[in-house]
């Protein structure tokens, strides 16, 4: 079985690169000839790993569609595959991959990567997204052999848009291995790992430290990541404005540097308004670090598996969670960390996720039964599609 993904393996892209790499790596370990095509590397770009065959588009992408003139030709030149799998929406690369698959009479999948959440649709470029849906995206999604989502919430949002294709709920994978670095001090250190952008709500952690005053005086907030320069400056200005001396900006870290920084953390936090999964939680729990997330992400298991805290998306609740974590004994944090590691081994390993993807591919090719985690569209979904398309053409959406 040959499968071609279009996505990215550039390490600085964070979660999407990590999850795509390990999914493809795992598929190859399962005997699937899984490859990827991606845009050309820019100066300073580093690949997430070297164990997956990579093809490159020859032309540079341009906004807002990330249009690249040679995209279709380069996909065709990569060879003929049994299945084509696009990562993300709103991108020319997805349309190009779908066009090639249709031309060759091959099935294709689309992974929205959280881009079809209502909050993500509404945050910017609403007119462009409305045009994209009306022009062809909704049609492409509804002709996909399967849409891959990471949780039930993401599936619900897709159904609400009128997407009637079968949907496979498969989480992102994380590499299960022993990490050589251990925490070397007794300081409570709250870590954030990921892209710095407005919707990540990193300022909530800064406000939490400010609200706790003397209680947090001996603790530290470690912010690991880069991205939006203006947003990063906003965060740094807030730290100065609030007079905090215990907030550290580490910038983007990779490899050994990232492992050492994460090992120094007592707890990791993901205060985002919404996430379709959130790889920072995977990165923390696999390292036996308890985590904090909001109910905007599908991490009920932090509470049910006693490996962290999932709280409502309010400043008060986020601050209370940080306070609880800070007041938790080292022994209890260690127990929570072990619980998290066992959860990762059981459900989120590269092997487990790759097996599920392979089963979906086999089902699409008529070589297996429909997996229990694949959900067919219902009549109500068709009705939702009809209503959505009507509103879309009447211009009532994204006002």
How does the language model describe each region?
Residues 309-316, 325-330:
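Conserved acidic donor-binding segment of nucleotide-sugar-dependent glycosyltransferases
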Residues 4, 148, 174, 182-209, ...:
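Conserved donor-binding/catalytic core segment of Leloir-type glycosyltransferases
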Residues 153, 173:
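Carbohydrate-associated surface elements
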Residues 103, 129-146:
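Membrane-proximal helix-turn-helix segments that form the acceptor-binding/catalytic region
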Residues 290-294:
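Short hydrophobic beta-strand element within catalytic cores of glycosyltransferases
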Residues 1-43, 48-50, 373-399:
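N-terminal subdomain of nucleotide-sugar transferases
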């Amino acid at each position: 079985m040959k499968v071609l993904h279009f996505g990215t393996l550039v390490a600085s892209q964070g979660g999407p690169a990590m999850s795509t790499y390990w999914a493809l790596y795992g598929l190859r370990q399962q005997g699937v000839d899984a490859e990827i095509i991606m845009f050309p590397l820019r100066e300073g770009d580093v690949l997430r790993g070297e164990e997956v065959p990579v093809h490159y588009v020859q032309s540079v992408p341009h906004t807002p569609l990330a249009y690249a003139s040679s995209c279709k030709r380069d996909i065709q030149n990569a060879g003929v595959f049994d299945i084509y799998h696009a990562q993300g929406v709103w991108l020319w690369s997805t349309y190009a991959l779908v066009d090639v698959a249709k031309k060759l009479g091959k099935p294709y999948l689309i992974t929205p990567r959280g881009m079809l959440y209502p909050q993500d649709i509404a945050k910017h470029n609403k007119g462009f997204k409305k045009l994209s849906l009306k022009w062809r995206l909704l049609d492409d999604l509804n002709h996909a052999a399967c849409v891959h989502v990471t949780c039930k919430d993401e599936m619900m949002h897709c159904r609400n848009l009128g997407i009637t294709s079968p949907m496979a709920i498969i989480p992102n994978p994380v590499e299960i291995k022993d990490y050589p670095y251990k925490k070397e001090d007794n300081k409570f250190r709250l870590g954030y790992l990921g892209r710095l952008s407005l919707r990540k709500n990193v300022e909530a952690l800064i406000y939490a430290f400010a609200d706790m005053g003397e209680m947090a005086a001996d603790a530290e907030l470690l912010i690991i990541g880069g991205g939006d320069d203006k947003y990063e400056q906003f965060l740094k200005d807030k730290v100065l404005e609030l007079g905090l001396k215990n907030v550290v900006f580490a910038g983007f870290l990779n490899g050994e540097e990232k492992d050492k920084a994460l090992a120094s953390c007592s707890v990791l936090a993901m205060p985002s308004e919404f996430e379709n999964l959130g790889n920072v939680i995977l990165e923390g729990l696999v390292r036996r670090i308890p985590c904090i997330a909001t109910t905007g992400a599908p991490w009920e298991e932090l509470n049910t598996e006693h490996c962290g805290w999932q709280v409502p998306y309010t400043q008060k609740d986020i601050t209370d969670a940080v306070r609880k974590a800070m007041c938790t004994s080292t022994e209890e944090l260690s127990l929570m960390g072990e619980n998290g590691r066992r959860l990762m081994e059981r459900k989120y390993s590269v092997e487990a996720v790759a097996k599920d993807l392979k089963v979906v591919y086999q089902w699409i090719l008529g070589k297996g039964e429909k997996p229990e985690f694949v959900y067919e569209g219902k009549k109500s979904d068709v009705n939702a599609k009809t209503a959505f398309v009507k509103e879309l053409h009447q211009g009532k959406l994204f006002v």
